[in-house]
Structures are given as C-alpha cells and as structure tokens.
Amino acid sequence: MESSLIHHIIIVLLLLWFISSLNRSHAFFYFLALIYLYLVHERYVMRLKRKLQFEERKQANQRRVLSDSESVRWMNYAVEKIWPICMEQIASQKILGPIIPWFLEKYRPWTAKKAVIQHLYMGRNPPLLTDIRVLRQSTGDDHLVLELGMNFLAADDMSAILAVKLRKRLGFGMWTKLHLTGMHVEGKVLIGVKFLRRWPFLGRLRVCFAEPPYFQMTVKPIFTHGLDVAVLPGIAGWLDKLLSIAFEQTLVQPNMLVVDMEKFVSPTSENWFFVDEKEPVAHVLVEVFEASDLKPSDLNGLADPYVKGKLGAYRFKTKIQKKTLSPKWHEEFKIPIFTWDSPSILNIEVGDKDRFVDDTLGECSVNIEEFRGGQRNDMWLSLQNIKMGRLHLAITVIEDNAKSSDDPLKKAKLNKEDIQTSFASDTTNLGSFSSDKSPSVVDNFEPIKIDGQEETAIWVQKPGAEVSQIWEPRKGKSRRLDSQIQRTPNDESLSNGSSSTDDNQEGSKNPMKSVGRGLRKIGSMFHRNVKKEEFLIGSIEEESQSQSPRINLKAVNQKDVGLNFIVDDNLSGPLSGKSLDGESLDAEENSGKGHMKDVAKSFLKQAEKSAKQIKHAFSRKGSMKPRDGHKEIVPESDSGTDSESSDDDDAFTCVKNLATEPGKLTRDGNIERTGDDDHVDSTTLATAKEDSSGDILEDSTDVEAKEEKLKEAAESETRDMDTAMNIKTEDEKGDTLKNIEEGEEKESSSK
C-alpha cells in the first residue's frame, strides 16, 4: 500500500513542479492536489479495512463453536490442499473462462469497442467458506439449497490480462491491456442442486448471491507495476457503478447462474451454462414533465436543473435545462420490476449541474405499490429537504398479465368477487340472517398438487369465515315451540305436563279464572264421551292450524328488522264460553272496569247454563227404571235434543280447559289425571251418576231436595265470585237468583 500511495504523491509533486516552472503557480492547483491525495488515501484505507476484517473473520471462524451455520473448517482445509492441484484450473479455465467474455460483451464501457480476456490465473489462495447451512424451504424445484458465506481475497500472484480495443474517436482504434492484479469478493452465496437418477447424478446447479456482494479489483494499465487506475477518483466511481450493475442484474437473487452439469461433464464441447435472468412481473412508466419554484443555486439567481431517479438497481437521468427555475423536460422512462415482495420505492432527486460538485435542489420518494392497477397517476410532488420547489410527474404501473391469465388458480382468484356475489344472493334467500345484506365471505382456494402435473387442476375451496345462523332474541315470557299440541293416532298419548305449570301459575295469579274454570268443569262432566272426543280432536286441529309460526325466524325475502313479543295463549285465554280469538292482546290488557263487569255477567250466565245441564241430566236419569237390579248406562250413540243443540262455543271452551289440565288423553278419549288429582274416566262418571241417582229415582220428593241443593251450590258459587271480583252489586245478584228460581219453577211445572 505504501509503494502505491508513494507513486501518487510523486506524480502530484511532479505536476506541481511543472506548473511552477511555467510561472503558473497558484494556490488553486495546490488545493486540487490536496483533494486528489485525500480521495486516493480514502480508497486505500477502505481496502486496508476490508483486508483486516477478512483476517479477523478467518481467525474467528477457526475458533468458533458450531452453531446453526457450521464453520466447515474441514472443507476449507481440503479445498486449500486441492486448490493448487486442480481446483484453480477448473475454476479459471472451465467455469470463469466461458462466463467472463459474456459479461464483457454485455457490460463493457462505452469507450471500449471490444474486450477479450487473454489470460486468467486466480492465485494460490482458495475461496474461504466462513459458514454453511441448509435452507429447509426451496422456492423452486431444487432438491437441496445451501447458503454459504464466501470470502475470496486473491493472493499477490493473481494475474489476469484483459485486452481492450478503444473506439476510433477516443483512441483511434488502438488495443491496450489492463492487468488485474488483485480481487476481493465477499458475500452470501446460494447454491441450488437438482439431482438425477443417472450419470452424472447432478443435473443442475444454480448459483447466485443472496444480496449484492462487496467486490473490489486492482486494475493497472499497460504493465503490472504501473499505477492502479481503480483508485483514481473518477475511474473508481465509474468502475464500482459498472460492477454493481453487472452483479445485480445477473448474479444477485432472483437472477442466478444456471449450470447444466450433463453438458459440463460431456466429452463434446457444448455451451453448458446460461444466465437465468428473471423476467419482470411489471414495468413502471415514469413521465417527468416539469418543475416549478426551484431554489436558485447559481450566482445569477438561476439554476441548471436535472432529475435523476433510482428504483432498485435501475437508475435514470433527464437532460440538463440551462438557466431556468421552471424547467420542462417531457421525458419518460420505463423501469422493470422483478418482484413485489420487496419494497418498490422510487427515489427522485432534483440537482443543479455545476462544474465540480452538483448541488441538490430537493428530493422526494414514491411508493410504486400504491399505484398498481394500470391507471395513469398524474401528480405534483413537493421537494423535501428544501422548503421550496415542486415536481410534476406521471406514474403508470403496467403489469404483465400474460402468464397470470393462463393459470387457472389465478383465474379463480380473479373471479372471487363473482363468487362472493353469488354466495350473498344465495344466503339472502335462506332467510336465516338477521340483516338484509349477508356478510362478505372471502373464499380461500387451496391448490392440490399432483405429482407429474405441471398445472394444478384441483382446488379445495374453503370459506374465509364460518357464517352461522344468527337467531333473533325473544322478549317477554319464554315459550317452547316444540311443545305444541298436534293430532296423533288414537293409540298414542299426549303429555301435557308443560301446560300444567302454566295453569298453576295462572290460577295462583288470578282467582277469577279459577272460579270460571271450576264452573266449566262441572258442566263438562256430564257430556257424552263421543261428543267430548269429537270436540277435543277438533280443538286440537284448530289449535295446531291457528298456531303462530316461528317468530324468531324471518320469512323468505323479509327485510324488516324488529322484535315480536310472545305471550302464551293461556295468559289471555277465553273467560267465557264464546271464543275470543278476534280480540287482540292489547285490547284485553287495556280494558277497564266496564269490561270486567261484562265478564262477571258472562260467568253468571255460564253458571245458569251449568245448572240447567245438571238438572237436565238428572231429569233424564229419573225417567229410566233399573232392570234386574242393575243400573242402566245410557249408550254413547244416544244423545238428547238439548245436548245436541248446545252451544258450540260452550263445548269448545270446556274441552279446551280439559286439554289444558294436566293429564293424558287415553285411547278411548278419556282424561286421565296425573299426580294427586282424582282419576276420572267415562265408567267412573257413569257409576257416579248412577250412584247419585239410585235412590232419587224411587222417590220424586228426593228430586226436589236435590234441586234445592243445586240452588244452594249456585248461590255459593255466585257469592264466591262476587267476593273475588268486588264489582257486582246487590241488585244484579237479586236479579240473577230470581231468574234462576223462575227457570226452575218452569221446569218443575212442565214435569
């Protein structure tokens, strides 16, 4: 390093001596000489730091304990022994020899018309593998992917001769030689291996850098002991830029070098390598129109602005507009994008062209991913770092959809919105969602990969979010919808245990209803079994038909959202023999005392009818004589005229109360109580009627006594009802009793 730096110092001193001999000595030349030596010194210091870091890492790797990435010291030792024997020749002549001309042809500088490599020797030092590890996941079809930390620092005996033919306008078409006497490469290398079942068993090797590597060369023109032009301020920057572009576009992931091992080991000479340059997935069209309100940077109050941009490894620059603060360029640049996985940030800088160092007039950045979709986005951007200045741009992202249209999986994803729309239309017809619009469900398409098929033809479609039925909550008293009374065959029984609790609750809450229910029970005991069964079945059918639908479910295509209060029918059941189906719940709950008086009157009428029915039953029993000491039971097919002409509403009311009482409907239509209640059936009723009328039929005077007892019972029923209601006056009671006595006198006179 010292000898090379001394060479530069000697050159500077000679130039200064020559200028002073011409009487052109000026402080400005000394200042330029100082800047030149400073830049050269910085370049040498950077190289020295890299060499020292290399030595430190080399020693640290030798002492390091094994971790996730192994140090593979055994491999470095083996390569060090094999390298001077055969590996160096294979690397320089078989691998790099065919590849370097391709690089020179594609990335040669504009000053060179042609470039060829005449000699290449890598030196005695082999590449050093700092660490190695296996990547479990592979993005391609490689069977094995290795990540190696490589560090190659060439020895002093490295030599490479590069012949360059200059262009005629620059060097009159002369040939010159460049000597590469040093090289330093450091970075992470990815190696993908694909195996074969036949010779040579290694089908393909893919090599690339995981990230842009550090690369430095020592280039000397004409002879090997000359000046290193790679450290000169102008040439050094230009050479670094050229090498970085060459590496990033060819050997940095996702671009990689592919080696066909079958052709590589074949005896015939074939082109065994090629560069796998990944095709861009999109292009960005950047249109630079104009700028306004730029900052004056020159002494004349103007500027010479230009725009340069950078997106990844690609750069662009506009032309220079002279002496203006509102330049107009109207230039466009097309930049490729290879992947959307990494951030795509377009960095733009507006500069002022000067003779030595360009000034910065402002910077701005744009995220390209925000403008995807193929639309042209025209915008004015404010320049940062400077308080003034704006830039007029237009950005258009042109995506390459040629391949995506052929992929059936992507087609399915493109039609995802259609699938969501059809799903939403189907679910609205089900009527099970609580809102008009069904929730948006994003379907997931999971491809099923089949060995031997390049394209996937089978997917598993899964909804993105499970949609369950949302039931509307009910307010008010809860009701079990599955405890409905339905018509069943005669050999089956119905259990009405659930209704008993409702009846008990109602009886305890309202004594008026318990009194009315007792009167209806007395009248229903003396009805015929056939008529009782007919009315019972008819009431069951009518109740099942008139039963309300499921309130908590919406009907098909129903759009309103609301709450329906459910109240049991038992809470608002009929209080008289007539049906109250036409009355609404609100009307019954909001009725006043006048309505309660009408209800009390209806109870009295019901009591009167019950008394008539009891008296009519005993009168029919009195007209029959016992035969052979046995009591005769009236056949079920025989019915009286009065019984047939009884009011249907009375019968329906009585039967409905029987249906709501706790018990079971037996095969012959009788009611069988459960719990501590009395067991009542048709035979028991008939026996009770015969026992109660056995002695009365022998003597007519006993009939009169029975009628008196019935009167007393009716009076006691009336008194109990008046006490419970507290709304019946004494006049109404007297009229009612008078009507009952008149009715009894008429019946006795007719007998």
From Swiss-Prot:
Binding residues for Ca(2+) 1: 298, 304, 352, 354
Transmembrane segments annotated in the record for this chain: 2-22, 26-46
Keyword Coiled coil: yes
GO MF annotation terms: lipid binding; metal ion binding
Isomerase in keyword set: no
Coiled coil ranges: 701-728
A single BP term in Gene Ontology: lipid transport
Residue ranges of domain C2 in the record: 267-381
GO CC annotation, single: plant-type vacuole
Region span, Disordered: 469-519, 572-751
Keywords noted in UniProt: Calcium, Coiled coil, Lipid transport, Lipid-binding, Membrane, Metal-binding, Transmembrane, Transmembrane helix, Transport
Binding positions (Ca(2+) 2): 298, 352, 354, 359
Positions with biased composition (Basic and acidic residues): 472-482, 590-611, 625-634, 664-681, 703-751
Every SMP-LTD domain range: 68-262
Polar residues composition-biased segments: 483-502
Superkingdom: Eukaryota
Locations listed in the record: Membrane
Membrane topology: Multi-pass membrane protein
Feature: compositional bias, Basic residues: 612-624
Annotated protein name in UniProt: C2 domain-containing protein At1g53590
